[in-house]
Amino acid sequence: MVKIRLKRAGRKKMPFYQIVAADGRAPRDGKFLEVIGHYNPTAKPHAVTIEKDRVAYWLNVGAQPTATAHSLIRATGLLHEMNLKRRGVSEADIATEMEAWQQREAERRQKRLTAKTRRRQAKKAAEAAGSAEG
């Protein structure tokens, strides 16, 4: 069975992954059929680039993405777009829906970042209050 998965590259403690279509029996960093994208987890924010037409091709011929590959593909919006096409939605409606999806996704990302910043500030304030008392 063909799987869409990550192939590790980069150097020690600086991972960089290729998103590949590979035979499920092949080792993680072994033989693969095609490179269909890249993922850089060390970049801030994480950098994901995929060739949407090739990923769509492999998914349509039955390739199964691993959990991590699935979440990366989903984060790009490709699965949502493919689902709309499968339902028979017109290209114009797909374009408007994908723009709306991009807006919602940007808002979610911003909301997560602000929540993370608030938690960090609260933690610093608690540490400062704790050190002032002690």
Curated annotation (Swiss-Prot):
Domain of life: Bacteria
Any one GO molecular function term: structural constituent of ribosome
Gene3D superfamilies recorded: 3.30.1320.10
Keywords: Ribonucleoprotein, Ribosomal protein
GO cellular component: cytoplasm; small ribosomal subunit
UniProt xrefs under Pfam families: Ribosomal_S16
Keyword Ribonucleoprotein in record: yes
Single GO BP term: translation
Region named Disordered: 105-134
PROSITE patterns: RIBOSOMAL_S16
Biased segments, Basic residues type: 109-123
HAMAP family: Ribosomal_bS16
Protein family membership: Belongs to the bacterial ribosomal protein bS16 family.
Name assigned to this protein: Small ribosomal subunit protein bS16
Source organism of this protein record: Chlorobaculum parvum (strain DSM 263 / NCIMB 8327) (Chlorobium vibrioforme subsp. thiosulfatophilum)
Gene: rpsP
